[in-house]
């Protein structure tokens, strides 16, 4: 069995965010040293409890401090961001650390409404209702095809195609399981959030559509 870990960089009593970040680095190094398979970091904003706010910034530091364990996001909250920029960030990470990068995607905001608004900064295409559109375009940008959004059909993504990051969807609901199955994505099940969720595995397998992922 392959054992993996996700760390939210918790800020414990009498410590601070800087200490939490350093502890995550040490934990990643330990997980690598005992042969674990993956190590993911989370995205939370404006939190007094969790220090990890930017997986795409944290990932290269962790990859540089380790030797073989896969490093990834658990996850990037796609509702806030441009699929184009997410694709470029993670294709660049995959170029730097080939065969070791995971792009875990989340559908939750990872923030309160005020912080979500600050992340959007006036954009009209944020929110969970845009996830399917953004996921379609992200898929196209990752694999080097024309985006489904007509305005972006001619957009090229750098760096050029090589190996792709493994792309996952974080799931804690039936809707999430359905989306993972529809897009043919590996599913990371949030059993620590929803204990009664094993039925989602059967639902996912029943509806799964194979894809490039």
Name each model feature, range by range.
Residues 175-193:
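A conserved active-site cap/scaffold subdomain adjacent to cofactor or substrate pockets
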Residues 1-66:
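N-terminal beta1-alpha1-beta2 module of alpha/beta enzyme domains
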Residues 3-7, 39-41, 71-74, 101-105, ...:
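Hydrophobic faces of well-ordered beta-strands that scaffold small-molecule active sites
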Residues 32-33, 59-68, 94-101, 181-182, ...:
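Acidic (Asp/Glu)-rich catalytic clusters
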Residues 33, 124-157, 196-213:
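An alpha-helical appendage that flanks or caps ligand/catalytic pockets
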